[in-house]
Amino acid sequence: MNLADFDYHLPPERIAAEPARPRHAARLLHVRGDGLDDRTILDLPALLAPGDLLVVNDTRVIPAQLTGRRGDARIGITLDRPLADGTWRVLLRNARRARPGETIAIDGAGGIAAEVIDRAPDGSATLRFDCDAETFRAMLDRAASLALPPYIPRPAGISEQDRQDYQTMFAAEEGAVAAPTAGLHFTETVLAALAARGVGLATVTLHVGAGTFLPVREDQLERHKLHAERGLIGPETAALVNATRARGGRIVAVGTTSLRVLETAAGDDGTLAPWHGETELFITPGYRFKLVDRLMTNFHLPKSTLLMLVAAFAGVERMRAAYAHAIARGYRFYSYGDASLLERA
């Protein structure tokens, strides 16, 4: 398939600039094999069965947006992920003024600077910050801000409300640049109803990287390569997933991040083992899902890798119909928008 197969027109007023309040007041489009149902997040427990298992991503978003100076040039820096040698993979804006071997002075960082180790044509680069890990983390709290997606305008800057809104209630393991947004809809009220229904809960970790903000530039999908993201599945989660499947329960991934880490670690027979490492799994129509039975996810950008993933999961034509329905019915899109619950095609 080509990139143009995943394009659609979204009226600008359908892009959510703020989350629903309370979080569980968001709408939920149930995409079934034989139709579409308009629901809310509070209906989620009734749409699942006793013995099903929800798998959520417990990554925590870090302040990852820095600015720096090279001479009179202002350079934007979005952290992506740390590398084993202590350097950081980043995305740069105005990167032409930052060549390998040169140094960027970080704004508001008390004298901390970063050496450019290498730079790629897509704006990604490797930086070495001249401080230890503890000092670096403290510097982020002083000098960095949340890297909100560009479609969430904040002309006055990031607020304390944003810092609260852009974390899920499951956030525990620091490392994400962007939030796993399907998890933003959960509250204690929803969790209590799920527990009363007999639905289990398990956690995985996938640290969403800065590559999530990059567009797909290849018209032929097979030529596109995802940026690597770090993840972990512990032994307790692996055991819960395997036990759920053995007794006939369904695995419900909360978010594309949870789905990608589960599918990365699953064996060909769907058995899950503890895992940690990096994944570059790029799911497009034709992919054979090994483990996940249902997917809860927000509504994604045109021509995005996440839209390709949901089309692979629920079917291309079914998702076209679902998105047309959601636009016509006034659903709110993207990170702070409404959600969908997809049954696997």
Curated annotation (Swiss-Prot):
Its main location: cytoplasm. It comes from the Bacteria. This is S-adenosylmethionine:tRNA ribosyltransferase-isomerase. Signal peptide: none annotated. It catalyses: 7-aminomethyl-7-carbaguanosine(34) in tRNA + S-adenosyl-L-methionine = epoxyqueuosine(34) in tRNA + adenine + L-methionine + 2 H(+). Transmembrane segments: none annotated. Its EC number is 2.4.99.17. The gene is queA. Keywords: Cytoplasm, Queuosine biosynthesis, S-adenosyl-L-methionine, Transferase. The lineage of its organism: Bacteria, Pseudomonadati, Pseudomonadota, Alphaproteobacteria, Acetobacterales. Monomer. It is found in: Cytoplasm. InterPro entries: QueA, QueA_dom1, QueA_dom2, QueA_sf. Pathway: tRNA modification; tRNA-queuosine biosynthesis. Belongs to the QueA family. Transfers and isomerizes the ribose moiety from AdoMet to the 7-aminomethyl group of 7-deazaguanine (preQ1-tRNA) to give epoxyqueuosine (oQ-tRNA). It is an enzyme of class 2 (transferase). One of its GO terms (cellular component) is cytoplasm. It comes from Acidiphilium cryptum (strain JF-5).
